[in-house]
Amino acid sequence: MGLFFNNNKRKQKESQEIIIDANNVPAHIAIIMDGNGRWAKERSLPRTMGHRAGMDTIRKIVKECSKLGVRYLTLYAFSTENWKRPQDEVTALMKLVVEFIGKEIDELHKNEVVFNVIGDVSKLPELCQQSIESAKEKTKNNRGLTLNIALNYGGRDEIVSGVREIAQELLNKEINLEDIGEKLISEHLYTRGMPDPDIVIRPSGELRLSNYLLWQSAYSEFWFSNINWPDFTEGDLRKAISDYQNRNRRFGGV
């Protein structure tokens, strides 16, 4: 037990030692919250315990992002493909969404966080939908960090949905063919009105996007870590941001 707390103190100290340039903080950070299942397996625990531990990490990272001045934080929580998981795990995940909102929404509201969800919410359980709508309504006028939780989200599904909307507008003669371009497509995505992610972070050692923000991440920087999400700390976030600040973003130029 003593070693655990010593490690925590060491990590906190390391976090404070990482210097962040306040003038170059990413406006939008996207994170693939991966490794909950691995974390649980390493401890001979049910996968659901890994997801629960991951909730604590969300709380810490949201607070750190708010403190650093990040404007948008998008967290990949449940993909369109995750419905293929065992039913008991899916049910537990949906319950955790409701639990997280119930426990955290007052604190988020107090800290001026705007709560938002991206993805096809209509496919989620009714209680989950109600919790989401209530949280969005409560925080909609806040002026701090916008927290996007990606639920029943898939990058390809998002693009297909946006293209269908555009096609319908074209059929209805609301737009002309010449109007269709990157700007119009972006306006028909779940992230409309938000800047694209400056950096996409993925813990757990996996080196892929997993159908996450495919359109929006065209020019994002990527940062990968072998740490599982429940063990991801404020210090790890600062390392990612520090690395981002030392990169030269060219956006296709020289």
What do these predicted ranges mean?
Residues 1-254:
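Flexible, compositionally biased loop and terminal segments
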